[in-house]
Amino acid sequence: MDKKILVVDDEKPIADILEFNLRKEGYEVHCAHDGNEAVEMVEELQPDLILLDIMLPNKDGVEVCREVRKKYDMPIIMLTAKDSEIDKVIGLEIGADDYVTKPFSTRELLARVKANLRRQLTTAPAEEEPSSNEIHIGSLVIFPDAYVVSKRDETIELTHREFELLHYLAKHIGQVMTREHLLQTVWGYDYFGDVRTVDVTVRRLREKIEDNPSHPNWIVTRRGVGYYLRNPEQD
C-alpha cells in the first residue's frame, strides 16, 4: 500500500509542486490549505507523514503540530522560512521530527521524506508485551519492542524521535557520539540535516528524564564533541 502524505501549505503553487513530486515517487498525497482543515484531515486520513508549513491561516503550523502530537506519532516535517531560526526551534520543541527551509530543493525534500518514513517503518513498536531485550540503566528502563520508557516505575511519554535517540544512546552507554553521527544514525540522513535538530531533541529528552534538566546527569555533553548516556545512580 502506498504511504499517505498530507501536505499542509496555504500557498497553492507550493502545495501543487509538492504533490506532483511526491506522487511521482509513488506516494498517495492529500493537501490541506489551512490549519483547521489540516487537523480534520489528520483525523480522517491518519497519514504516514505530514509536511506542515508554519504560516497558515486560521491555525498556524505550531498549533496544528501540538494538536496532532496529542494523539498521533507520525513523522512531521515543518516547512519554515529560510532565516527563521526561531520557527525551526519551536517546531522541534513541540514535537516535529524535522524541518525544511524554503526555498527547498526537491532532492533534499524527498530525501528527508524517505528518511523519516524509513525510520518510522523500521522502528515501529510491536503489538506485544515487552520482551527480554529491555535495557536497564539504573531506574531507567527501555522496552524496545513496546516503545516504552519508564523511570522509577513511572512511564515517560516520548515522541518517536526522542525514543529513538535515547534507545541508541542506551545501546552505546558511555560512548560519546558526535551530533553528526547521531544525525546519520538516528535520523537516517546521509548528507542532509542540521545538527541543531540533535541539540533540540536532546534538550527535550533531558526535560523528560532528568531530575534537574538544567544540570543533566543522564545525558551528558562532552564539550566540543557530542553527547553520551551514563548511569548517575552508580556514582
UniProtKB/Swiss-Prot annotation:
The modification 4-aspartylphosphate is found at residue 53. The keyword Transmembrane helix does not apply. Signal peptide: none annotated. One of its GO terms (cellular component) is cytosol. One of its GO terms (biological process) is regulation of DNA-templated transcription. Residues 4-117 form the Response regulatory domain. Phosphorylated by WalK. It comes from the Bacteria. It is found in: Cytoplasm. It holds the Pfam family Trans_reg_C. Its main location: cytoplasm. Keywords: Cytoplasm, DNA-binding, Phosphoprotein, Transcription, Transcription regulation, Two-component regulatory system. GO terms for molecular function: phosphorelay response regulator activity; transcription cis-regulatory region binding. Residues 132-231 bind DNA. PANTHER family: PHOSPHATE REGULON TRANSCRIPTIONAL REGULATORY PROTEIN PHOB, REGULATOR OF RPOS. Member of the two-component regulatory system WalK/WalR involved in the regulation of the ftsAZ operon, the yocH, ykvT, cwlO, lytE, ydjM, yjeA, yoeB genes and the tagAB and tagDEF operons. Binds to the ftsAZ P1 promoter sequence in vitro. WalR has been shown to directly bind to the regulatory regions of yocH, ykvT, tagAB/tagDEF. Activates cwlO, lytE and ydjM and represses yoeB and yjeA. Homodimer. This is Transcriptional regulatory protein WalR. It comes from Bacillus subtilis (strain 168).
